[in-house]
Amino acid sequence: ELEEWFTDLVLEYKKWTDFMYQWKLTRQAGIKKMQFPFPYREGQKELVTQVYHTIYHQKKLFLEAPTGVGKTISTIFPALKAIGENRADKLFYFTAKTITRTVADDTLELLRFQGLRCKSVILTAKEKICFCEETKCNPVACPYAIGHFDRINEALFDLISHKDRFSREIIEEYARKHNVCPFEMSLDLSLFSDAIICDYNYLFDPHVYLKRFFAQGVSKDYLFLIDEAHNLVERGREMYSATLIKEDFMALKKQVKTVDTVLEKRLEKCNKILLGYKRECETYQIEDFIDIFIGALQSLSTRMEKFLEDHDENDHFVSQDLRDTVLDFYFKVSHFLLIYDLVDEKYVTYSYFTESGAFALKLFCMDPSTNLQGCMEKGKSSILFSATLLPIQYYK
């Protein structure tokens, strides 16, 4: 019986490895045949050559060129050629705008008419692609979560066997066909994709980056194309900063006081420390020492974890709304603690009053360059391009 189980397991695994082996041969042959689809415009061939040389030498390139020059195809084409020469295995196209994601996807489709064989996926935010009215990822609230892992392998193999372009519409079609979560399916499809088109946060955000690719110890056989790169500095500041609002502690305290007195007390302790900061703050105040608050916050985080473990989706003692409120606040606290671990001389910690009069404590990342650089080191080469990258030293 054990031998039969093991044999079935190996045969199932072999199906996937055989497919991926044959696909890589097909992909490499297609890339070699692929031709640039247009006559080169003035300066465009030099641009394509420079991108390829940058990838060849595993360097970083800052590229400024006006709108209409063809930056998208002039970066994607040489990157794919480099993959065809076994200089990398995956291409990531990062952009902050939906429209530029569409342009990148259309560019790959255009190159398919020139011989390219390439599996590509567009990663869409969970809230946008979710089939349910409310995005609650648990088997109680979401019918697609029930038995998802029992069906996902068949769904994936069906899709990758029949399509090369995994657009949102195609992912939704196959997710409905197999009754699986479209968001989780898109993430799994990225493992079988040669080109992944997505938002900056899938590489740069310390919470939502793709751990299957960018966790420590994972292969770095990737190329990064970063579109609209002039936006990356400000986005980096946002992703590596964190804010907590005093009034949120009080609001949650009132909601949990009848169900968890320990959690109530830990919320109150954090609130009292923030109240001390508030009394010293007129408009804003630099806070050089917040270790006592961080200690209280860590204790609060631990208690919220226990609360969520004790009161899961099947617990009728606590309402789902309260559980969701605690979970949301837990994520905010976790983010603040994660960012606090990154604080160095490039950060400033300060308290201030919001426009609505609420009191806030902020860890502000003034210069995200070290964090962004660390993320880009997870790939072999990075091409950062935009119509506006001046002054270049600022972005470097």
Label the predicted regions.
Residues 171-196, 207-215, 307-396:
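A contiguous, basic/glycine-rich beta-loop/short-helix subdomain that forms a polymer-engagement track
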Residues 19-64:
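Conserved pre-motif I regulatory segment
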Residues 196, 201-203, 218-251:
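SF2 helicase catalytic motif II
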Residues 56-78:
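Walker A/P-loop
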Residues 2-12, 16-35, 87-196, 201-204, ...:
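A substrate-engagement module of RecA-like helicase motors
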Residues 52-53, 72-87, 107-111:
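Walker A/P-loop NTP-binding motif
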Residues 92-94, 196-199, 223-226, 381-386:
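Structural recognition of the conserved hydrophobic beta-strand(s) that form the central parallel beta-sheet
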Residues 56-61, 89, 380-381:
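Pre-Walker A (Motif I) flank of P-loop NTPase domains
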